[in-house]
Structures are given as C-alpha cells and as structure tokens.
Amino acid sequence: MPREDRATWKSNYFLKIIQLLDDYPKCFIVGADNVGSKQMQQIRMSLRGKAVVLMGKNTMMRKAIRGHLENNPALEKLLPHIRGNVGFVFTKEDLTEIRDMLLANKVPAAARAGAIAPCEVTVPAQNTGLGPEKTSFFQALGITTKISRGTIEILSDVQLIKTGDKVGASEATLLNMLNISPFSFGLIIQQVFDNGSIYSPEVLDITEQALHTRFLEGVRNVASVCLQIGYPTVASVPHSIINGYKRVLALSVETDYTFPLAEKVKAFLADPSAFAAAAPVAAATTAAPAAAAAPAKVEAKEESEESDEDMGFGLFD
C-alpha cells in the first residue's frame, strides 16, 4: 500500500509540474540553500495570487520535463540548470516585481562555522562593549584594538570574511559576540525562463534608459568606424555629407570656383566689417517697433489716469 501511495504521489507531482509549465509562460529557477520550512511557508504566502513555488527532487523534475518535450521543446533549455538544491517559481506577473518580492523575503542569519559565505563580511570600527580579557581573541584575528573606558574598541573597519570563504570558528564566534548577523538567506534566482528564452537574472536590471544609452553608443561607434574606412552606412552618411560640404567650401574659398552657398562665406571673408555694421542695424530695426510701442502705452496710461481723476471730481462736486 505505501508503494502505491508513493507511485500516486509521483504521478500527481508529474501532472502538477507539467500543468504549471503549460499554464505559466514565465518562471524562475531558484536556489533554496539554507531556506527553512517556516521561511518557505512565508514566501509562499507572500506570493499567493501572483506566483507559485514548486520544489522537488531534481531527478523527478528532469523526468517530468523530458516527458513533456514533445509538446514544448523549449523546456529542454531548463534541464542543464536543474542542479543543486533548486526549485521553480512560476508566474504570469512582471518578473521584476516577483524578483523584488523574493528579495524582500530574505531573512538575516548569523554566521555559522563551516558555512560558505555568500557575501563579504566587514566588521565596522566600534566600541564592542567587551572587557579587556577578550583582547587576545581580537589579536588572533588580526584586528587592531585599544582599551577605551574599560572596554575593547575596534579602531578601523576590518574585512573579516570574503565572498566564497568558509566561515571559521573564530570568525563565527566574534560575529555572534558582536550581535552581527552578516548573512541573509532566501530563494536566490539563478536563471530566468521567459516564453522559451532563458537568461541570467542580471538582465532584469537593464532599464529602457540603459538600452537607449547603449544603442546610441553603438550607433556612434559604427559611424566612427565607417567614417574612418570610408564605408557608407545610415549612421555615417550624414557625417560624410557634412564633412564633404566642408571640404568643398574650403576648396571654393581657396580657388576661383564658387557656388551659391559659398558666395556669402567669400563675401564675409572679403569684408568682415560689412557684416559687423549690418548687425547693429538689424538689432535697431528689431528694437524700433518695441520702442515705439512703449510711449504709446505710457500715453494710454496717462489718459486713463486723467479720465479717472475727472470721474472722481465729478462725483464729489
């Protein structure tokens, strides 16, 4: 009987994962190292209505996906990434929103001896509140200290653990004494599967502005290379036309050859003072209507004031 129950459970699991893969076009492959059952329950509750979390044995997940490749060949891209303690988070919502919800459900954790550090740990300069008898403990870790008012004070920030290092017993003890919980554990997104495409989670950080900036940089680079090698493209042709016009204009100035657009430049070079004299005249012409309008406004104002005064005297006569 237990074997039949186990077989039924496996069959239901296969049906569930296949149904989720069919119903949801997007999912995360997430790492679940150091995530306890209580934290997993909290994550499921926070994602309720927006995403579905599915964990399981890697062999069962691979078997279910391989059995469904005929109907959806794109699922084969998931297989190489199902290794280690991983699971799926299926969703139809915005991937960035779900990613942020997963990050919000990380919980701080104390350093344990023998654990692999997921991040760098730095102990800040501070008064530890510990007595002088602990000085040798800090010296063994290479931390510079002094005694201040009967307690140990760390003089400068100290990088205690590097990313990927194994946490030693001394480091773990020190962090616990200082009440520092340097790590945070939760579901870590390892890969993103989106409508048949699979990519790194860093892609979610790329904004439209960043894409626009990179595109413009690419266009500038293409235009620069094409100008240097003389190969015309849509990006380089406007620059080629402008550069060509400048060369023709320079040639026209140095020779007797002329054309309508070059005549004004030649005239300016021949007599710059004529253009200098024309500038104040143009400015005066523009300013004259404005100056004429100003007295008219003053006159109108004076007339208005006079009529107001007449009206006032008439009322009190």
Swiss-Prot record:
P0 forms a pentameric complex by interaction with dimers of P1 and P2. Identified in a IGF2BP1-dependent mRNP granule complex containing untranslated mRNAs. Interacts with APEX1. Interacts with FMR1. There is a cross-link at residue 264 (Glycyl lysine isopeptide (Lys-Gly) (interchain with G-Cter in ubiquitin)). GO terms for cellular component: cytoplasm; cytoplasmic ribonucleoprotein granule; cytosolic large ribosomal subunit; cytosolic ribosome; dendrite; nucleus; postsynapse; postsynaptic density. Ribosomal protein P0 is the functional equivalent of E.coli protein L10. InterPro entries: Ribosomal_protein_uL10 (IPR050323), Ribosomal_uL10 (IPR001790), Ribosomal_uL10-like_insert (IPR040637), Ribosomal_uL10-like_insert_sf (IPR043164), Ribosomal_uL10-like_sf (IPR043141), uL10_eukaryotes (IPR030670). The gene is Rplp0. Residues 294-317 are annotated as: Disordered. It comes from the Eukaryota. This is Large ribosomal subunit protein uL10. Its main location: nucleus. It is found in: Nucleus; Cytoplasm. Signal peptide: none annotated. There is a cross-link at residue 297 (Glycyl lysine isopeptide (Lys-Gly) (interchain with G-Cter in SUMO1)). CDD domains: Ribosomal_P0_L10e. The keyword Phosphoprotein applies. The modification Phosphotyrosine is found at residue 24. PANTHER family: 60S ACIDIC RIBOSOMAL PROTEIN P0 (PTHR45699), LARGE RIBOSOMAL SUBUNIT PROTEIN UL10 (PTHR45699:SF3). Keywords: Cytoplasm, Isopeptide bond, Nucleus, Phosphoprotein, Ribonucleoprotein, Ribosomal protein, Ubl conjugation. GO terms for biological process: cellular response to cAMP; cellular response to interleukin-4; cellular response to phorbol 13-acetate 12-myristate; cellular response to Thyroid stimulating hormone; cytoplasmic translation; lactation; response to selenium ion; ribosome biogenesis. One of its GO terms (molecular function) is peptide binding. There is a cross-link at residue 297 (Glycyl lysine isopeptide (Lys-Gly) (interchain with G-Cter in SUMO2)). Ubiquitinated at Lys-264 by RNF14 and RNF25 in response to ribosome collisions (ribosome stalling). The modification Phosphothreonine is found at residue 59. Belongs to the universal ribosomal protein uL10 family. The keyword GTP-binding does not apply.
